[in-house]
Amino acid sequence: MDDLKTSEAWRIFRIQAELIDGIETLNDLGPAVSIFGGARFGEESPYYAAARETAALFCRQNLAVITGGGPGIMEAASRGCFEAGGTSVGLNINLPREQHPNHYQNRSLTFRYFFIRKVMFVKYAKAFVIMPGGYGTLDEFTEAINLISTERIPKFPVILVGSEYWKGMSKWQGCWHRLPQ
């Protein structure tokens, strides 16, 4: 039992190391936009095309683009930024399946802990673009809205892409008219 307590206590150093590595890697990034979206959208998806084009537009305005670094929407946004000559940041996560870093990243970090990864998304972004996705996208979206609504971070644009996709959430939540302006 003492070994378990000791190993758990040492976990704090791994958490601290991930946080320091993220800050050191991104500290000179400059203004950026975080684009969130699902891993399962392929190149044939209109959402893939929209993410690619949106990221390219941001990069042409000298904004870096931060994504989850994986496939699907994350790849599309990274690719659009990379092809536009911008800085594409991938915040990858160790998962048992699905998540593999895409090839369109100028800066890449891999995290074990979701909460440290989310700190990096929030700390360096001036806006969030939320594309269709799954539980991870929903988690990132609600984290951002919660931090803004509780005034833990300054208010900034949170853009939902795909009104039809988000309609059910909007109806369930009933709060879009109350989102921080």
Stretches found by the model and what they are:
Residues 38-41, 94-96, 133-137:
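Short glycine-rich anion-binding loops that position phosphate/pyrophosphate groups of nucleotides
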Residues 112-164:
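Active-site/ligand-binding-proximal alpha/beta "capping" segment
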Residues 26, 32, 94-105, 115-118, ...:
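Amphipathic, Lys/Arg-enriched alpha-helical "gate/interface" segment within cytosolic domains
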Residues 72-130:
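Acidic/glycine-enriched connector segments
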Residues 78-79, 102, 140-143, 171-173:
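Short amphipathic alpha-helical segments
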Residues 75, 139, 167:
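Alpha-helical elements of the RecA-like P-loop NTPase motor core of helicases
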Residues 2-91:
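Glycine-rich beta-alpha loop segments
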Residues 82, 143-148, 174-178:
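Short, solvent-exposed amphipathic alpha-helical segments in soluble enzyme
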